[in-house]
């Protein structure tokens, strides 16, 4: 089906339930939904995290996508659901399958019971039925839960997201800050298609006014396809640094990470992520413009936040912890 941008109809005024609304992408989605006149309700897992909202326009309900019994109160009178919860590494009592498959199934069931008319689901580019990559496989499983629900849906598969408070670009900034030679696993030629988190949030807000986007799965990227080497260079330029790269053999790093991830509670990178380095994380060029009618912002000139990363922050991230002042934006 050929999709083209259509004029926005202004305020939509729906009751929208957002999961993951206090997170990096979620805060931007909540803002985009409010700006378009929707009533926003957030499912909040950790009491207190709703403090990220400086306004009182957001209704808060406490619950967990892993606890179906906690969801019913949050979903009353909901007309649309935006499901954002996902993890990039397994945690205790929260495996990829727990969160991406079963958690999504629980949210879908609650949405269906509430009579929701649109389910907007953020997955990941590369999601597929290949069990070799647990992250991407469970993302695909989550998509199947949505598709099989009978609720009209829109699924987004974004490439890597950037924006203040992100993890990917901030970690690279930490490496640039700490190392005169920036370590790169493998050739660094693996491809990305960075998309601003603000722009994905805008796409989600626009979707609620678009009947033609129901039943669609959308791979989304920004204005430029880049290699990992290119991204490192762009981060270094944004920080006013000149850095050479030091390429580490993939097999050696795989063995090293296999040992350290058994020791560190939150390793900088996992063996699964190393194995996924060979997967191209790119979408069709111009997809955002064609479908949503606006040009996404480029990474260059829009990552000034990397200058907030200090040497101590870089060391902290190497040890597996994201500094609070970098993520709380």
Regions found by a protein language model. Give the residues of each.
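Mid/C-terminal beta-alpha module of Rossmann-like enzyme folds, strongest
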Residues: 6-10, 207-269, 283-329
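Oxidoreductase cofactor-interface core, primarily capturing Rossmann-like NAD(P)-dependent enzymes
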Residues: 9, 129-239
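Residues forming the Rossmann-fold NAD(P)(H) cofactor-binding site
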Residues: 26-27, 101, 140
């Amino acid at each position: 089906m050929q999709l083209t941008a259509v004029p926005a109809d202004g305020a939509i005024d729906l009751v929208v339930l957002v999961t993951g609304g206090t997170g990096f992408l979620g805060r931007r989605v909540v803002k985009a939904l409010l700006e378009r006149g929707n009533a926003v309700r957030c499912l909040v897992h950790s009491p207190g995290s709703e403090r990220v909202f400086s306004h009182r326009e957001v209704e808060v309900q406490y619950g967990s996508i892993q606890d179906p019994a906690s969801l019913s109160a949050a979903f009353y009178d909901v007309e649309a659901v935006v499901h954002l919860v996902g993890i990039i590494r397994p945690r205790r009592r929260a495996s990829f399958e727990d969160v991406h498959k079963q958690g999504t199934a629980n949210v879908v069931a609650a949405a269906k019971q509430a009579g929701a008319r649109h389910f907007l689901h953020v997955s990941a580019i590369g999601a597929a039925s290949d069990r070799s990559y647990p992250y991407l496989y469970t993302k695909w499983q989550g998509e199947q839960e949505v598709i099989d629900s009978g609720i009209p849906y829109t699924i987004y598969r974004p490439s890597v997201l950037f924006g203040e408070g992100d993890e990917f670009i901030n970690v690279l900034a930490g490496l640039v800050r700490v190392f005169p030679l920036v370590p790169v696993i493998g050739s660094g030629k693996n491809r990305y298609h960075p998309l601003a988190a603000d722009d994905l949030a805008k796409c989600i807000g626009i979707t609620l006014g678009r009947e033609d986007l129901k039943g669609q799965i959308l791979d989304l990227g920004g204005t430029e396809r880049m290699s990992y080497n290119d991204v490192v260079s762009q981060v270094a330029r944004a920080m006013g640094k000149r850095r050479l790269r030091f390429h580490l053999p993939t097999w050696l790093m795989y063995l090293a990470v296999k040992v350290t991830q058994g020791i560190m509670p939150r390793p900088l990178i996992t063996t699964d992520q190393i194995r996924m380095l060979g997967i191209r994380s790119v979408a069709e060029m111009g997809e955002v413009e064609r479908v949503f009618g606006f040009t996404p912002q480029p990474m260059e000139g829009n990552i000034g936040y990397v200058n907030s990363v200090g040497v101590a922050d870089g060391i902290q991230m190497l040890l597996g912890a994201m500094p609070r002042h970098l993520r709380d934006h």
